[in-house]
Amino acid sequence: MKISLFGYGKTTRAIAENLVDKFGPFDIYDDHFIETKKDTLGNLLLNPNDFDDNLSDIEIPSPGFPPKHKLIQKAKNLQSEYDFFYDIMPKSVWISGTNGKTTTTQMATHLLSHIGAVMGGNVGTPLAELDPYAKLWILETSSFTLHYTHKAKPEIYALLPISPDHLSWHGSFDNYVQDKLSVLKRMNECDVAILPKIYANTPTKAHKISYEDEKDLAVKFGIDTEKISFKSPFLLDAIMALAIEKILLDTLSYELLNSFVMEKNKLEELKDSQNRLWVNDTKATNESAVMAALNRYKDKKIHLIIGGDDKGVDLSNLFDFMKNFNIELYAIGISTEKMLDYAKKANLKAYKCEVLSKAVNEISNHLRVNEVALLSPACASLDQFNSYAERGKVFKECVNKI
């Protein structure tokens, strides 16, 4: 059986490295490969022009591999890593949505690791590196993965709210939503799907539990929010994690949940040498995440760094939302001019900075002790950085130099 891997990302590299003895050598296709070479394990590294669909039995893409790529268009036996590993996948919980996937996955694993749960997927560990004998896989599941998945399904599907994101990849918001909901048609009567109320009528055999907001979800599962130390925008993530625990174990471990430590890059607060507040929210790459951040600091004047790769999303609603705040904007990245245009139409004051270091320095000229400087860019980072984490790291380095 000849397996072709599309893209040389974390997912496909893990398959190539961990399964070469069982299924390899693999043919790995990536636009960065100009000449045919072999890696140290004997896998072939090939240019996409060399792909012959008649000589390939299975094609597995990296999750973010675009549907319009010529390899995807030519493939006849395409399947996601979820489909590829489904036959050995233990019971699983899939967590998706636009914002909060990572935090909810980490919180749920924190609550359930004592029963042998492990986490992976979009967060940290590819499926090829997960223990197939673990009691439970808790998988952060992206819309990219769901787009390519047609066989695998979880025992529990926890869907957080959906808002516009990755539209240039999916083609439209409706396509994005449909990919998020696609797994429901494969679930059966023994499975559970937790869904925003707006999607409550989506056909599925699974037992559906719909919710309107974090308060409603808490009521549905008998969760006392007063016992949870996390506040919005992380409260919904915490409630969802407890809901998953409730379904599986019929317990609610508030103390264990409250011992969870948030990861960096999400509303990460730091002070400069003048005791002024700066917030690293580099992971806020869409409008709903930025709205949540703005609401958190609504009682302060906000100096917002915004911009980057906007992924083809119309951010007009976000800028209309900003009219409710005492706010000044600092535009960066490839979308600088677009951000300035949005700001002008919304009658918001904005500075043309283009690069992050200049934005930090400009804010420093205006920021007062009772105000907040917020990096919550509403855009991806790859126009100027290798990752959102690198963007956050550079932001903190700039602040520490003040």
Swiss-Prot record:
EC main group: ligase
Top-level taxon: Bacteria
Cell division found in the keyword field: yes
Cytoplasm keyword on record: yes
Pfam families: Mur_ligase_M
GO BP annotations, alphabetical order: cell division; cell wall organization; peptidoglycan biosynthetic process; regulation of cell shape
Cellular localisation: Cytoplasm
Reactions that this protein is recorded to catalyse: UDP-N-acetyl-alpha-D-muramoyl-L-alanine + D-glutamate + ATP = UDP-N-acetyl-alpha-D-muramoyl-L-alanyl-D-glutamate + ADP + phosphate + H(+)
Enzyme Commission (EC) number: 6.3.2.9
Main location: cytoplasm
Record pathway: Cell wall biogenesis; peptidoglycan biosynthesis
Molecular function terms from GO: ATP binding; UDP-N-acetylmuramoylalanine-D-glutamate ligase activity
Positions with a binding annotation for ATP: 97-103
Keywords assigned: ATP-binding, Cell cycle, Cell division, Cell shape, Cell wall biogenesis/degradation, Cytoplasm, Ligase, Nucleotide-binding, Peptidoglycan synthesis
GO cellular component term, pick one: cytoplasm
Similarity remark: Belongs to the MurCDEF family.
Function: Cell wall formation. Catalyzes the addition of glutamate to the nucleotide precursor UDP-N-acetylmuramoyl-L-alanine (UMA).
Name of the protein in question: UDP-N-acetylmuramoylalanine--D-glutamate ligase
Annotated source species: Campylobacter jejuni subsp. jejuni serotype O:23/36 (strain 81-176)
Gene this protein is translated from: murD
